[in-house]
Amino acid sequence: EVQLQESGPSLVKPSQTLSLTCSVTGDSITSDYWNWIRKFPGNKLEHMGYISYSGSTYYNPSLKSRISITRDTSKNQYYLQLNSVTSEDTATYYCTSLRFAYWGQGTLVTVSA
C-alpha cells in the first residue's frame, strides 16, 4: 500500500519561506510522478507542480518564480519550497501520486504575523 505523509510548520510569517516534506512509503519516488496540491479556504484546489521519476520538474506558471520541488531518493522523500509567502498562501497542502491515486492527509499552513 502506498502511503504519503506531509510534514512541516503550521504557521509561517509573511515574506518567509514555506518548506514542506512528503515522505513516501510503499513505492519508490524514482518510479512515478509526485505532485504538490493545495486547497484554499472555500475548497478551491490548485496544482502547484510535480517532480518526475527522473527528477525533472513542472511548476504551475502562476507560482514559477516562487516555487521549488526537490527530492532525496535515499530517504524516499520529496520537498516543496515556496518563497515570499503572503496570507493568500494560507491553505491545506497535499502531496499526491501520479493521477492523484494516493494522497497524504494534508497539512494546514497559515501565513500570519
Swiss-Prot record:
Pfam families noted in UniProt: V-set (PF07686)
PROSITE patterns: IG_LIKE (PS50835)
Transmembrane segment boundaries: none
InterPro entries: Ig-like_dom, Ig-like_dom_sf, Ig-like_fold, Ig_sub, Ig_V-set, IgHV
Alphabetical keyword list: Adaptive immunity, Immunity, Immunoglobulin
One cellular component (GO) term of this entry: extracellular region
GO terms (BP aspect): immunoglobulin mediated immune response
GO molecular function per UniProt: antigen binding
Other information: This chain was isolated from an antiarsonate monoclonal antibody of the IgG2a subclass. It represents a second idiotype family characteristic of the antiarsonate response of strain A/J mice.
PANTHER family: IMMUNOGLOBULIN HEAVY CHAIN
Stated name of the protein: Ig heavy chain V region 36-60
